[in-house]
Every structure is written in structure tokens, then in C-alpha cells.
């Protein structure tokens, strides 16, 4: 199984490292995450400037990782495009709580929704 891991708290968040490590037990993992915090971005996508991605300076043991100058939804779209087949997108582990009205603008949840829009299963935590 090919698992794409992302978040809205950035490539430097301890939550994404923990999620990527746990996901390794279930398949091949790739991390594609924002280069800076993108909390509360909702389903936003970048349309007014070029997107770039670079190998991550953060080391994820046994996992290929990239940072992106975009939103969580951008990361999912780019990550699934770069990887011919993606079976599952995991988004998180979020630093804060995604409860109640916060769900409407959660970048963490939006990444999982973006996966579904692209025909891939998505889970947010």
C-alpha cells in the first residue's frame, strides 16, 4: 500500500513525524507537507504563484519527504501527482483540536477531503 502523509502544521511538526513512522508498518510512505504552518487554510489551493517542492531537510527514517510552498490541499494534489499510485492519504497528527466549527476551516481535514476529491481514501487526525 502506498501512503501519502501530510498535515497543516508544516514538515517540521512532531505530529507528522509520528504519523509517518506509524504508517511505515502498513506500506510504502511518502511525506509531502507545507514548508510553513498552514493551519485554518481550509480547502484553499494556490493559484496566484508557482508551487515548488524540495527534498525535506527533516529526516524521516525510511521515508521520502518533500516540503511544498503551498497549502495542505496543494500538498495532496502534488503528492498524488508525483506518485503514480496513492492508496491512502493520512493527514495529521494535528497540533491543536479539530472540533466543532473549527472543522469548517481545518487544513488537516481539508487534506483528507482533497484526497477524496482525487479518488483516494483520506483520514485526518
Predicted regions and their residues:
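Glycine/threonine-rich flexible loop motifs
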Residues: 97-106
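Nucleotide-activated donor-dependent transferases that construct or modify glycoconjugates
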Residues: 1-9
Amino acid at each position: 500500500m502506498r501512503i501519502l502523509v501530510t498535515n497543516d502544521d508544516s514538515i517540521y511538526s512532531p505530529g507528522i513525524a509520528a504519523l509517518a513512522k506509524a504508517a511505515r508498518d502498513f506500506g510504502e510512505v511518502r511525506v509531502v507537507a507545507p514548508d510553513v504552518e498552514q493551519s485554518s487554510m481550509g480547502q484553499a489551493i494556490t493559484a496566484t504563484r508557482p508551487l515548488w517542492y524540495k527534498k525535506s531537510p527533516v529526516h524521516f527514517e525510511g521515508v521520502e519527504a518533500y516540503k511544498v510552498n503551498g497549502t495542505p490541499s496543494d500538498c495532496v494534489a502534488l503528492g498524488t501527482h508525483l506518485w503514480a499510485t496513492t492508496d491512502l492519504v493520512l493527514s495529521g497528527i494535528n497540533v491543536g483540536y479539530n472540533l466543532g466549527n473549527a472543522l469548517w476551516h481545518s487544513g488537516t481535514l481539508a487534506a483528507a477531503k482533497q484526497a477524496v476529491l482525487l479518488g483516494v481514501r483520506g483520514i485526518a487526525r
